[in-house]
């Protein structure tokens, strides 16, 4: 019987690993098999927590702009579809947007998976997991890993008949979240002179840090009346807007 050791992939409350070749001495340890088993582990964990059959779950999956994102997303979506989970393929997205897919009523996902490795080198990737309570904590990730390492758990999740009949559904989450950001910016800015375009006359600088967030600068319509919109540095005062925009909170729990 093959033994699995995925504990080395745990980085606090995230999964992080080497997803592609390219750096000497760093072998791939987050490939299709690891992704398959971790995804089934998450589905089982979510089913247990919600006391809900796996085939009744709805899970969204999205990713940042990393080179391995599409392959990992395909593996995750196929894995979930084959065990009967309703899957929303959100494509390019941001971490806060993926959390909000559990909150927006037209999505109402039981859980979400964000494929990202934040600031790590190009050959790395990883997973952030969410439910309606926020980002999973270290203990939750440890439980998912234990399930992923268990053949009894993985093999007990039966493939549904004709899984191709219900493929992953593509959803424009980045557009929906952009609308959400626009509404929050209008609300927080409270510009009585330009209520629908509260940033009119301002010079705004947006720094996406090579991440997916840069697309929101184009999609959030309230930017369009600003003078000389640019990219390259942090948006001053964005903290207040981010807080209002639904950033995912960490669930209380042991983090050490």
Give the label of every model feature segment.
Residues 1-76, 166-204:
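An N-terminal, well-structured beta->alpha segment
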Residues 5-6, 11, 19, 123-126, ...:
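Glycine-rich, flexible loop/turn motifs
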Residues 13, 115-118, 132-133, 208-209:
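Fold-independent oxyanion-binding glycine-rich loops
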Residues 16, 64, 93, 128, ...:
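Gly/Ser/Thr-rich beta-alpha loop segments that engage phosphate groups in nucleotides
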Residues 44, 52, 58-124, 219-256:
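N-terminal small/polar loop signature for handling phosphorylated ligands or for N-terminal nucleophile
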Residues 125-256:
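Gly/Ser/Thr-enriched, mixed-charge loops and adjacent short helices
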């Amino acid at each position: 019987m093959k033994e699995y050791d995925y504990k080395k992939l745990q980085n606090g409350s995230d999964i992080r690993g080497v997803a592609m070749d390219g750096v000497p001495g760093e072998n791939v340890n987050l490939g299709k098999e690891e992704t398959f088993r971790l995804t089934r582990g998450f589905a089982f964990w979510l089913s247990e927590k919600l006391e809900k059959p796996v085939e009744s779950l709805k899970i969204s999956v999205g990713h940042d702009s990393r080179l391995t994102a599409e392959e990992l997303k395909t593996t995750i979506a196929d894995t979930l579809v084959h065990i009967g989970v309703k899957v929303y393929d959100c494509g390019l997205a941001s971490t806060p947007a993926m959390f909000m897919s559990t909150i927006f009523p037209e999505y109402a996902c039981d859980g979400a998976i964000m494929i990202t490795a934040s600031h790590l080198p190009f050959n790395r990737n990883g997973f952030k997991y969410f439910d309606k309570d926020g980002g999973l904590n270290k203990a939750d990730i440890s439980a998912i890993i234990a399930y992923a390492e268990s053949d009894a758990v993985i093999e007990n999740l039966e493939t549904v008949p004709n899984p191709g009949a219900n493929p992953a559904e593509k959803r424009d989450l980045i557009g929906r979240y952009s609308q959400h950001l626009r509404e929050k910016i209008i609300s927080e800015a409270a510009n009585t002179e330009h209520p629908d375009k509260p940033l009119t006359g301002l010079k705004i600088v947006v720094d996406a840090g090579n991440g997916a967030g840069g697309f929101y600068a184009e999609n959030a319509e309230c930017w369009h009346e600003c003078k000389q919109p640019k990219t390259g540095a942090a948006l001053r005062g964005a903290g207040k807007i981010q807080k209002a925009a639904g950033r995912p909170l960490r669930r209380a729990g042991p983090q050490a």
